């Protein structure tokens, strides 16, 4: 009886962990189909689980989703998170930290180029809204992205 109980608990834990990683995969599908609200909901749920906390793919997906939220022309998507571009940056930073196999530098370089543009646009919006401290922080982030080893490793300096 104990063995059966132990096996059942082990199977439950394995299934629950797989379900969380499945949410990341499903979030990617929603992102690809343009359903950013659903993608955000799923990635947020998945990131709350310990099986995704140390998974580089989950953070890369989170970065893509939040970056897409910021870049979206749909106002309802932009309203989902006013700090989406900053959260995308934080997620990409976590990818660099977790990517021990170095699978993501080329993918991150693409995202970084777009992220620099996003932060430039955000800085301009904030400057025009007379939020100078936030605008300066966004401009500093652009400089940080441009000088990042992800972009400078290939000899790229300007975006």
Segments the model singles out, each with a brief description of its role:
Residues 7-12, 39, 81, 135:
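Generic alpha-helix initiation/capping and coil-helix boundary signal
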Residues 21, 55, 153-159:
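Alpha-helix initiation/capping motif
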Residues 20-80:
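Start-of-domain marker
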Residues 64-158:
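Short coil/linker segments at helix-helix boundaries
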Residues 1-29:
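Bacterial Sec-dependent N-terminal signal peptides
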Residues 8, 60, 146:
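Residues that line or immediately flank small-molecule/substrate-binding pockets and catalytic motifs
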């Amino acid at each position: 009886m104990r063995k059966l109980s132990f096996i059942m608990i082990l199977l439950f834990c394995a299934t629950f962990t797989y379900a969380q990683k499945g949410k990341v995969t499903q979030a990617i599908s929603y992102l690809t189909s343009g359903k950013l609200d659903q993608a955000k909901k799923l990635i947020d749920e998945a990131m709350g689980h310990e099986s995704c906390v140390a998974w580089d793919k989950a953070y890369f997906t989170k970065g893509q989703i939040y970056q897409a939220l910021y870049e979206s022309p749909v106002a309802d998507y932009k309203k989902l998170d006013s700090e989406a571009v900053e959260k995308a940056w934080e997620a990409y930073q976590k990818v660099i930290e977790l990517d021990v196999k170095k699978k993501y530098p080329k993918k991150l370089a693409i995202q970084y180029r777009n992220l620099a543009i996003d932060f430039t646009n955000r800085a301009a919006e904030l400057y025009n809204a007379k939020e100078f401290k936030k605008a300066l922080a966004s401009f500093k982030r652009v400089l940080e992205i441009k000088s990042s080893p992800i972009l400078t490793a290939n000899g790229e300096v300007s975006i």
